Amino acid sequence: MIARLQAAVGEPDARIIVRTASAIAELVGPLPLRAGDEWLTIGVEGQPHIHVRTADVAALAFAAPDDGNVAIEAHDAAGARIVRVAFSRTNPAKADCDVGRRAALIDRHGGAQ
C-alpha cells in the first residue's frame, strides 16, 4: 500500500491534497515519499511537506470518474479521507484533458485496490 502511494506522489503533476472543513493544503509533485517509524513524509524536510501517520492509513481507493481527475485517496479505518493524490489534466469533462495520460495513469495505478 505504501509503495502504491509512493508511486502516485512521484508522478509528474500529481496534486497531493489534505483537506479539512476549514483549510486545504496542496503540494505539486513529483515528490518523494519516505516511510519513517511512525510517519510517512511526502515531500522534502526543510521545504513544504506533509506528514501522514502510517498507522492511520487503512486503505487506498482509486477513482477515475467521468467528471473528475484520476485520483488515489488514502483512507483511515472509518473510511475518512486522509490525503488525496489527484492527477491534473485528467478530467475527461474538460477540454484540456490529456486522454493518453489519463489512460496510462489508469493502467498504472488503477489495479488491485
Predicted features, each with a name:
Residues 1-113:
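Surface-exposed, interaction-prone regions used to assemble/regulate multi-protein complexes
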